[in-house]
Each structure stands twice: as structure tokens, then as C-alpha cells.
Amino acid sequence: FRSKNADLVGYYDTNAAAAEEAAAFTQTAGFDQVQQLVRESDILFITTPDSLLVPVWEEIKGMSHRNQIICHCSGALSSDSFSGAKEAGVSCCSVHPMLPFSNKFSSYQQLEHAFFTVEGHPHAVQVITDLLTSYGNEVCRIDAAAKPEYHAAASILSNQVIAVLDTGYR
């Protein structure tokens, strides 16, 4: 997003050094309290492993503001994980790039050409789809029920591509 001149607010991580490292890399702010980041963001990307999505959502749900979009850059979990989103006044979705992330300081360069799937609340899906397509990415909407199968297929296929390329380079 930074390479496309998106207006980024910053990062929060339970490991403050990791948030500061990401913030320095993207020339944004590192937040030491999640409330600050939630309060200042119109779109909030949660980039945790699936096992932490629900606990993180439960922590920030009461901090979210009306019309905010919450987007999980997900594995196998769908936007159904965001229980109580309607009552909180937020629109939630999950977005999944067909891309392996092997290095946090270089993998982002491949995002420009990545294919994404998105599912969730219609408003969130539309906003995220518009954002990604404005950057030149191809986006496909999928059904939440298909999310686990999609993730499994994406993991296998993207890892096979890496293995084939590695074999080719040898």
C-alpha cells in the first residue's frame, strides 16, 4: 500500500519492536496501544495467524467506530469470525492473496501482481475490491463457506510453484 501512496496510519503489535520496525520500513507510526490505531483508521487490516483472529477481534470490537472496515488478511478463516460486527457498526471481510510471504521486507514487492480473493460484508468487499483493482490487482469474490478449501488449495499451489521455480534455478 505504501508503494501505491496509500494513506497509511501505522502498525500495532504486541511486540512493540515489531510495530516500530514495520512503521520505520513504511514511514508510518508505530503504536504502543491498539486503541490509538483503531481510533485513527478507517480501514483496519488484521494480519494475525488464524489462531489469534477471534481474540484480537474480541479485543478491538468495542473500540471500532461506525462505518469502519475490518479486514483480516486471512488463512482459512472467513469473515464469519467477526461475531457482533453488525452491532458494532462495522463491515468486515477477509482478503487472501495468492502469494507466499517468505520475507517481510521483500515479499510486498510481489503484491503488485498478486491475485486476491475477498469475501464478507458486501460494503467491505466492495471497498477492498475497489482498492485492490485500483492498484492493478485482479480480485475474485468467493463465498465464506469456500474459504477453508480455497486456503488449502492456495497454500499447496503457491508452495508448489516455489518448489518448481527452485528446481528450475538449480
Residue ranges and their predicted role:
Residues 3-26:
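NAD(P)-binding Rossmann-fold cofactor-contacting core
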Residues 9-13, 70-73, 116-119:
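Short, hydrophobic beta-strand segments that form beta-sheet elements in well-ordered domains
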Residues 2-3, 35:
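Hydrophobic, well-ordered beta-alpha structural blocks that scaffold small-molecule cofactor pockets
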Residues 18, 22-25, 89, 106-170:
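Internal alpha-helical scaffold of NAD(P)-dependent oxidoreductase catalytic cores
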Residues 15, 74-77, 99, 122, ...:
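Glycine-rich beta-alpha junction loops
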Residues 4-5, 25-27, 66, 87-90, ...:
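Short, structured coil segments at secondary-structure junctions
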Residues 10, 30-32, 141:
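A structural preference for short, hydrophobic beta-strand core positions in alpha/beta folds
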Residues 30, 34-106:
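Rossmann-like NAD(P)(H) cofactor-binding subdomain of soluble oxidoreductases
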